[in-house]
Structures are given as C-alpha cells and as structure tokens.
Amino acid sequence: MILSFAACASDKSGSDTTAASDIKTDAATAPAADDSTTAPETTEPATSGTDAVSAAPSVRRGPTKTTPAADTTKPASGGNSGSTTVPSKPDDSKPSAVETNPKKIIVSAEKEWIFTEKPTDSCHASTVLPLDNGTVVAAWFAGSSESDDDVKILTSVRGTDGKWGEPIRVSADPNVAHWNPVLFQNDDGTITLYFKVGKDTEYWKTYYSVSTDGKNWAAPRELVPGDNSGGRGPVKNKPIRLKNGTILAPGSTELGGKYRCFVDISTDNGKTWNRTPEINSTFLGFFKTPMIQPTLWESKDGSVHMFTRTKVGKIYRSDSYDGGKTWCSAYPTNLPNNNSGIDLDTDDSGRIFLVYNPVGIPGIRTPLTLAVSLDDGKTFTKIKTFETGLAEYSYPAVVVKGDIIHITYTYERDYIAYWQIKIK
C-alpha cells in the first residue's frame, strides 16, 4: 500500500504560496531560536490517498509471566530498581514479522531482545544509537510502572560479539520518575543521553548525561536550568544535525493536558538552546491540533520537515525553509496515527524509513510497521511488519547507519526488542 500526501508549498524565504496538487502514484508498485519568531501560515493540503489497513492483525499471545516466588532477579547497578518479578523469557517461537518487501530493499532482518530476564516490572520508550566501533547503545525507562517514583533510565551496550551488557541505571533524582531517554552523538564522539524528570508530564524538566562509551555516565545535569516550560530539548526522538552544523531537537510539552510541539535549536554543539514558538495547526478549522513527539529530517535542498504524533487519527507534518527557525502550520498526512509514538531516519541516498503503528483512532498500538519513502516523504510504502499481536508494540526508535537500520521498540511493556535490518 502506498500512502501519499502533499507538502505545504513555500518559497526559500519561508512564505507560503499555493497548495500542492495531489500526488500521483503508480498503482503497480503498491504492496498488500528565537522566541520572537512566528511560524508562517499554510494553505490547505491535498488529501489524496488512502489510510486503510490492508489486513487486520492476527491474534497472538505475548510472553507468559509466572507468579513470582521471591525477588530473585538481579537489579541493574546504580540504585534501587523497585519491585521485580521472575517472568518467563520472550517466546521467539511465535511469528512476529510479515515480510512485504516489494522493491527488495531489505536484504536481511534479525531480531534480538536487549534483555530476557526483566530487571524491573515494566519498561518503555527506548532509544538506540549505533557507534562507529560496531557497538550499539540503547536506553529506556523502567520501574514498577510508568510515572512511579522508582522509574529510572536504564542503558545497555551491545558489544561487537552481539551480546547485550547488563543494564546500567542513570538517575538524576532517586525520588522522582524518569521518562523518555534520547541518545545523540556529537561530532567529537561524545554521547549525550537526554531524559525527562518529573512526577507528571506537566512538570517535566530535561536532564542530560554524557559518556564516551555508553557504559560510564557522568552525573546528570539540567539542560536548561530554571526552565519551567514542561521540558526542553528532545522529548522522544533524536535530534538531527543539519548540513551547516546546527542541531535541531524535536520537542513538545503537555502543559494543562495540551499537546504542543516546538524545536530547540543549538548552534554551539548542544551547549545552549533556543526554543522556537509552538508549531501552529488547526483541527476542523478552529481547534488547535494536539501534537507531540515530532521526528525530523533534512532534505537534500536544505529544507527541514517534521512528522508528529496526534490525537486526531493522522500523523501531521510541518516544513521549515530557514533551518528550523520558523515552521508552516502543521497539516494532516494520509498516514494513520493512534496517538502513539513514531520515528524515522534517512539513509545516505535520501530514502526515509518510518516506523509507526498504522492504525487510526481508536486503535491499540499494533501492528508495528516499517515503511519507506523514495520521494522525500511524499509517499510511503510498507515494507515490513514487526509485530501483529493484539498487545502493545510501540514507541519505536530508528537510526540508519550505512546499510543497516537499527530499530528498538516497546514489547508489551515487558521487554525492549531490537532489530538489525540490512538494506540495499
């Protein structure tokens, strides 16, 4: 299936012109800165295409849990892990992927578990970062349950032998919940781990820790000391570095239960940040569209784009033509969204690889699917489905490095799955 939509048209100065026409697709290829800046308005986007799901997910049970007799699991180092159980390992005998690779983009795909003995009762919101030395760093939040005080950030490193190391705890406050880690590597090789701290999303503050190897982390520090906006810097998905060296961090807040997106901009390698105004958008002509957790990419012409999670059944998109300083009003794509996290990345040729739950509102967070765009985000073709069970498979993170796509995601809030997908 190919999904298509039109971008907001804009000239190089950032001012909007006319609406783009409907994108035509070949049916034969279809498979089953500154706080004072203002965002320009956009014309109404075209809405051609379809968001129909080609097949309903099959029923499949998740890993069976056993009743804990005692707290015998080994907690991760670095602090109190909270209560633990003794679950069974994930069941790899169940089919979990549906291959729909029409253009033969995928050469091979291998699935792993970052851990099979749960260090905590619950886990969610992973992030992944492959390094030049062949190792892979992952992080996620874990504890009794989301928002509980014992929820902290756990990290693990996959060695060149293909084995994941013991999870390591990173904590800025032992008495407050931690959320949504994001990994990013600077040009000098330093790894930065961003994460949120706060009992509730309204009161988030952003902290960061640095490392040279993903195993040893410096004491966390607040990203923007004194900020009370509900969190600065990246909120779920990784920052991107533009061709000119500027770093854009996709951010959002949930103050008063209102979903609002913005971009944090750094021109000094992450030392200081300037927040853009909220990205404008309207739903049904007058309501502000509830949008959070954007994911970004830069096109070959230097324009920058975002997709966002929403509460209105569609992924929304916005575009910038001045390096992320101003953004056109966000508009709906034809990609469905069930108020669940998404992520994407580009390869060296400009192909965009998007991981998402292709389900509208209402809908549970399944299936979880990989789609590719060969035309800079105008159309997407599904090429792989990772999970199809009637459970939660969500919050993907994706990084393309060379000819390998690295993907992590939440598996039923019990495990973190990791995929290596070789592409051509």
Model regions and ranges:
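Short, low-complexity, disordered segments immediately C-terminal to signal peptides
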Residues: A9-T37, T42, T50
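C-terminal motif of bacterial Sec signal peptides marking the signal peptidase cleavage site
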Residues: F5-A7
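Ser/Thr-centric signal marking residues that sit
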Residues: T17, T73, S266
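Positively charged, low-complexity intrinsically disordered regions
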Residues: S13, T25, R61-G62, P90, ...
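Intrinsically disordered, low-complexity sequence elements enriched in Ser/Thr/Gly/Pro
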Residues: S10, D22, T38, S58-V59, ...
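N-terminal low-complexity, Pro/Thr/Ser-rich intrinsically disordered segments
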Residues: T43-A109
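Asp-box/BNR beta-propeller blade signature and adjacent active/binding-site loops
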Residues: V86-K424
